[in-house]
Amino acid sequence: SIAAPPVKLAMGLLIVTALGLGNAAYESGNIGGAALGLAALGMTAAAPWPALMIGIAAALLLALGNLRWLMRLLVALVMLMSLAFLVACIAVAPDLATVARGLVPRIPEDGLFTAIALIGTTIVPYNLFLHAAAARERWKPADDASDMRIETIVSIGIGALGSITILVTAAASGVGGDITNAADIARQVEPVYGPLARYAIGLGLFGAGLTSAVTAPMATGYILSELWPGGDPEQLVFRGTATLIVLIGTLVAATNADLVAVILIAQVANGVLLPLVAGLLVYLAYRSPDISRALVSGAALVWLICLLLGTRLVLRALGLWP
């Protein structure tokens, strides 16, 4: 915890700006993704109705409070989609030498923001705080540290594997062209699943979108309520923040904007905010008596180097750096 009021205020402003605004943008991508999933499943209602329905559903689920059973169902849908891409990745038989070369970091011309979006959707900033809040309730401070590390490694590994299989499948399937809707995504796995591809992708997108449409406001509410701990104010801050995030995301997704573009912009925003959140976590780790200062110093050095190099790349992409 942070006792000094000035430091707590400064960190609160950073969190409100970075995660509040960032999650509001990300929520529009969540709702847009779920709407794309419904479109793939055959729901042809015109905008803004799909987004409004999903936003209302997310708000009701947050109001009900008991989300454990729903989360398990939606996570199962997302896992099924990930499994579908894993099978498709094996079935399209990618050239292993090409896949190995792809493990070497290389950003093609005009591909920086796509790379940032990929990072932003794989390592979502608010998930770091949501995991911390969940870990505090589930694990004891010191006794279960090794189990916590194993859980983190496994969960991050599964997420990374999912991203890799999707990228490899899309690259090796031979289906080119821009992605503008769920049907374009489904074509990536049509060589394996045929006409069932649209339903597999539709269910996966809907599950992933609705899951995140609930957890993103929850995470923002948890984080901001930590600034006003104790009693009813905490509950009021949590519910008010979560409702506001859902409302903003729904209004943005309900416009006639390109949903794929909305999702991409939201992921880029997450990728840009990630260094700020990482720096905050390094600072909190530095204050912890349970973590080696030498270990934190090394992490701080890595963070600083990545921040400088990342800032340079972004400025070059914007034409502000020679």
Each model region followed by its residue ranges:
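Membrane-water interface regions at transmembrane-helix termini and the short interhelical loops
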Residues: 32-40, 55-76, 253-262, 285-289
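Transmembrane alpha-helical segments of multi-pass small-molecule transport proteins
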Residues: 13-16, 41-63, 80-85, 232-251, ...
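Transmembrane-helix boundary/entry motifs in multi-pass membrane transporters
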Residues: 1-21, 40-47, 150-153, 187-198, ...
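Extracellular/periplasmic helix-exit of transmembrane alpha-helices
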Residues: 135-136, 157-184
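Hydrophobic alpha-helical segments and their helix-loop junctions in multi-pass secondary transporters
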Residues: 78-104, 115-132, 280-289, 310-321
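Membrane-interface loop-to-helix entry segments
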Residues: 53, 62-92, 107, 269-274, ...
